[in-house]
Amino acid sequence: MLLAALRTLFRSRPGTAQAAAGASVKTAIEAGKQKSLAGDHSGAAAAFQRALAAAPTNAEAHFRLGLALRDQQRLNDAAASYRRAIELQPAYVEAHNNLGSVLQMLEQRDAALAAYRRAVALGPTFGQPYLNLGRLYTLAGDTRNAAATFEAAIARGIDVDSFRHLLSALKGETTIRAPDAYTRSLFDNFAVDFDRRLIDELGYHVPETLAQRIKALAPQSALRILDLGCGTGLCGAALAGCYGQLTGIDLSGPMLEKARARNLYTELTESSIETWLEHAPPAAYDIVLAADVLIYCGDLAPLFASIAHRLVTGGLYAFSVEIAEGEAFVLQASGRYAHPVAYIRSLYAGSGLTEVNGFPHHIRGNVNGYIFILRKS
C-alpha cells in the first residue's frame, strides 16, 4: 500500500524531476560563474560542461562555456560555443557580441564585423557592440563607419561621454581628459585576464623598471607608497619588501579585486585619482607611482601640483607616459593621450619637483614612451 501511495504521489507531481534537474543546472552555472571570477577558467569550463550534460539546449551554459574557453585562449572552441548559443537563442545579443570578439582575435575581420553588426541590430541599447564595432572599423582604417557607429550610440543616449571621447579621438580633437565612465568600463572589461594580456601578449614591464629605479634611489624598507591607478597590483608586486605602507587607488572595482587578492596593499580605494587626492593629507607619502595611468589624462598640470603637495621633501614621483611630438599633449585615435617630453618638463619646473631620471622606454606592444622619476625639493 505504501509503495502504491508513493507511486501515486509522484505521478501527481510530474514536474518534480524536471525541477530538480533545473536546479542542478542552475547550481552548475552559478558554480562556473564563481570559478570564472576567481580566475579558475578550466574549473569554470568543467562546471558549464556539467550543466550542459544535464541540459544540452541551455543557451546560457553554451555562452558561458564560450567565455571560459576564450579565457583559456581556446578561441575556435569558444566561437563554436557562442555559435551554439546563437542557434538555440538567435537574439542572444551577448553571444553575437562575444562571437565577434573571438573572431577578431582570430583575425577574421569580416566575420567579426558581421557579428558585431548583428549584435547592434538585436540590442540597440547595449553599448559594448557599438564600442567593439567602432573600434574594429577604426583598426581597419574605416573612419567613416567608425564615426557613424559612435554617433549612433550617442544618438541613442548610450554612455554618451565615453562615445564622445572616442569620437573626439577619431576626429583628432584633443580634450582635457578621458571621462571616468570610459576608463572604468575599459578596465572593468579587461580585469579577468589583464595581467596575462598585458605581460605575455604586449610585453609590459613598466612596473619592474620603475621598481628597479626606486629601489636604487630609496633603499629603505618602510616607505609610504601611493600607487595611483594601481590596477591589479603589478607595481605593488614589483616593489614587494620596499614599503611599510602601500595605498592603491583605482576606478575599476574588478581590477581592485585582483589587487586585493595579492594581499600586498595596506589600503585599496575605488575612486578617481583627482577626487582621492583632493582629500589626501599633505606630505604623507615617500613615493607616488603612476604606471601607464597618465595616458587617460591630457592636462597634467593640476595633477602634478596635487601630487607634489602629497609628497614629503625628498620624496619621489615615478611615472610613465606615451610620447608625442611638438609641445602640447594630444588625444590619439586609440583614445589615449600622449605628452611631449618638453611639456612634462615645463610642468614640474614650477611645482617643486626636479628630474632624477628620464629615459625612453618601451611601454607595451608597439607603443614607446618615456619614464620619469622626479624628486620633491
Model regions: which residues?
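A short glycine-rich, Lys/Arg-flanked "PGG" loop and its adjoining helix->strand segment in the class I
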Residues: A301-T313
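A short acidic, Gly/Pro-enriched loop at the edge of an enzyme's catalytic core
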Residues: E278-V288
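Conserved beta-strand signature within the Rossmann-like core of class I S-adenosyl-L-methionine
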Residues: G314-E322
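Class I SAM-dependent methyltransferase SAM/SAH-binding core
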Residues: L226, C230-L277
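Conserved alpha-helical positions within TPR/SEL1-like repeat arrays
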Residues: K26-L37, E60-D71, E94-M105, Q128-R135
